Structure formats: C-alpha cells, structure tokens
C-alpha cells in the first residue's frame, strides 16, 4: 500500500489533496512539500489523527487533519484537486463516497479497493479474528464495475486501472483512478 500511495501522490499535476480514511498515516512520507500546498487527512477516529500529527511534524505547514464522519458530515469537507481513498469505500458504501466526492469536487480521484474472491471469509485469518465479528455490519463487498458506474453517475471517467496485487485468501488490491469529465466541469462551473 505504501508504494501505491507514493504513486498516487506523484501521479497528477495537483497542489491540493484529500486523503479519506487517513488512519495512522501510512504513506504520508511521500507528500512532497515542494508540490503540495495543502493535504487534508480525514478520519472518524481522532486518535488516528493525533498519531498522524505526532508522526509527521515535518508536514505541519501542509498537512491538515480533519475529524469527520463521512456518513454524516460530508458537507463539511473542503475542496481539493485530488482525492485518495484507499480501502475506505468498503466501509462507507458507494452513495456516501459519491456524496463526499461531489462535496470535495476534485479533478482526480484515486482509489484502492479490496476485491474478495472468497465472499464468506473477507477478513484474513488471525488470532484476533473475533475482533472483527461485527465488521460485517459496515463492510460493503467491492466490485470494480459497480464503483466505476457510481463514479460515472457523478461525472467521473475511469482513467487508470492498475495491475491487481494478489493477497492471501483469494483477495486482491486494485487501484482505480478517475478524472472529472469535461461535460461535468462545464456543468459545475455554471452552478
């Protein structure tokens, strides 16, 4: 995931980015302060955001952490040119993700989703498996075509689909990037 984030931060000619579900901040070391004016790290967990601030003091002039619940507070999201959402859509669902993207109004959206070929067991075997017992209540099975259709509905076209990285238990990570379509840019500039 770290290497993927490095690619995501470098991929597009942007100065602002928003990371939805920043968690503990893995991959933020790839933020180049000579490229980015502002990077927003969004998470529902304030302890994660505190850890990010402590872990990356060198980004204090660029990185701004936002404690928000994307399901209920998407209207508080600020605008950015790039949205990065890695392993997040599985937990908030397509409609909430669409709402967040529309609010942020980026030129580019870069997502990593986990594709599960074994639907019955989407959490990896671990001695701590019981800790995930209720995760089924918030986890949404991801499908590449459904995500791309959801993005197309809100005016974004797929521009990149990375090689799938195979993981244990029949899982894979897939990076899919989108760009705002020209028609959508023209329509949104009139509102």
Language model regions located:
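Conserved alpha-helix/loop element of class I SAM-dependent methyltransferases that forms part
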Residues: 1-15, 26, 30
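Class I SAM-dependent methyltransferase SAM/SAH-binding core
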Residues: 16-72
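Short conserved loop adjoining the S-adenosyl-L-methionine
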Residues: 72-78
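A short SAM/SAH-binding and catalytic strip from SAM-dependent methyltransferases
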Residues: 81-95
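Conserved beta-strand signature within the Rossmann-like core of class I S-adenosyl-L-methionine
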Residues: 106-120
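Short, glycine-/aromatic-enriched active-site segment of Class I SAM-dependent methyltransferases
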Residues: 116-138
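Short alpha-helix
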Residues: 135-155
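Core SAM-dependent methyltransferase catalytic element
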Residues: 161-191
């Amino acid at each position: 995931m770290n290497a993927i984030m490095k690619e995501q931060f470098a991929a597009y000619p942007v100065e602002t980015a928003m990371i939805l579900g920043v968690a503990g901040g893995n991959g933020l070391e790839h933020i180049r302060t000579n490229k980015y004016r502002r990077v927003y790290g969004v998470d529902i967990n304030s302890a994660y955001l505190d850890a990010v601030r402590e872990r990356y003091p060198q980004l204090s002039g660029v990185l701004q952490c936002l404690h928000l619940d994307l399901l209920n507070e998407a209207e508080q999201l600020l605008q950015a040119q790039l949205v990065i959402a890695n392993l997040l859509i599985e937990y908030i669902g397509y409609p909430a993700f669409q709402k967040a993207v529309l609010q942020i109004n980026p030129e580019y959206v870069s997502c990593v989703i986990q594709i599960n070929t074994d639907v019955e067991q989407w959490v990896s075997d671990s001695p701590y498996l019981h800790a995930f017992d209720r995760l089924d209540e918030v986890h949404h099975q991801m499908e590449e075509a459904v995500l791309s259709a959801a993005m197309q509905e809100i005016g974004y076209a797929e521009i990149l689909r990375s090689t799938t990285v195979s993981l244990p238990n029949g899982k894979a990570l897939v990076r899919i990037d989108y760009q705002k379509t020209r028609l959508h840019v023209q329509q949104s500039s009139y509102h």
